[in-house]
Amino acid sequence: MRLGAHLSIAKGLPRTAAMATSIGANTFQYFTRNPRGGAARQIPGKEIQAWREARRRADLYPIAGHLPYTVNLGAAAERQQEFTRMVLHDDTLRVAAIDGEYLISHPGHYEGERQAGLDRIIQLIEEAYLSITPPGPMLLLETMAGQGKEVGTIDDLCYILEGLGWPDRVGVCLDSAHLFAAGWDLRTPAGCQQLVQELAAKIGLDRVKAMHLNDSAAPLGSHRDRHAGIGKGELGREGIAAVVNDPFLGELPLFLETPVANYEEYGEEIALIQKLKSV
């Protein structure tokens, strides 16, 4: 089981590796830059060398960078498009520099017509990401709750992937809280299997690479993005157990993004999930 959490790399990647180990994680996700804006931290070559050794010792895999919330792949305004294009391009290279496997992004919001927004997402990914010569991290588009003009249903992601020509370098990251808020009832094994069947039919399971494992503070089908601690939300322990024991969902790399006061609380959630895995 590959299970970890969203951790900071502000004090250096080797320290993040040590933190992951201390909470019982064998994978982690991090923001590629300040999630609310600002310049990216430059990672020195010596730090990258130390990181590679620390990662090897800790058996951390996979590593996922997450683009900041200020990125909007569906932006209509030219200034916002330029910013998003720059961040997607530059942060792809930054994740590649530390040998990260995945780069996760919210698909974004549309302005005006929904299809026009989806088409802008396709164009921006082509220009800023697919233009980069491999190897590099696989871009994973995240399933979203569907707040307002937010893009991120399974049908949306299918449209984007089809528009891109189904490239091997673009895939999907699920989010249990977002899916629940979007109307997918994951509280039972049958509900989880219904989701898996939909993914198999429209996306292809080989393209689904990771999941953000979060409980939901928002009700089923509410289209509100509100995370809760593991077992403390609408999914509850029973729902989290259904997800982690699903033959497909439970074998994905799982990243916690739950509201915690400190990283030690992530450790408590990881221990709980490991117990639920055997239920």
UniProtKB/Swiss-Prot annotation:
Binding site for Zn(2+) 3: H178, D225, H227
GO biological process: base-excision repair
Matching InterPro entries: AP_endonuc_2 (IPR001719), AP_endonuc_F2_Zn_BS (IPR018246), Xyl_isomerase-like_sf (IPR036237), Xyl_isomerase-like_TIM-brl (IPR013022)
PROSITE patterns: AP_NUCLEASE_F2_3, AP_NUCLEASE_F2_4
UniProt keyword DNA repair, yes or no: yes
Residue sites binding Zn(2+) 2 per the record: E142, D175, H212, E257
Amino acids binding Zn(2+) 1: H66, H106, E142
DNA repair recorded as keyword: yes
Keywords in alphabetical order: DNA damage, DNA repair, Endonuclease, Hydrolase, Metal-binding, Nuclease, Zinc
Catalytic activity of the protein: Endonucleolytic cleavage to 5'-phosphooligonucleotide end-products
Cofactor: Zn(2+)
SMART domains xref list: AP2Ec
A GO MF term: deoxyribonuclease IV (phage-T4-induced) activity
Group of enzyme by EC: hydrolase
Cofactor notes: Binds 3 Zn(2+) ions.
The EC number(s) this enzyme carries: 3.1.21.2
Similarity-based family: Belongs to the AP endonuclease 2 family.
Function: Endonuclease IV plays a role in DNA repair. It cleaves phosphodiester bonds at apurinic or apyrimidinic (AP) sites, generating a 3'-hydroxyl group and a 5'-terminal sugar phosphate.
Name of the featured protein: Probable endonuclease 4
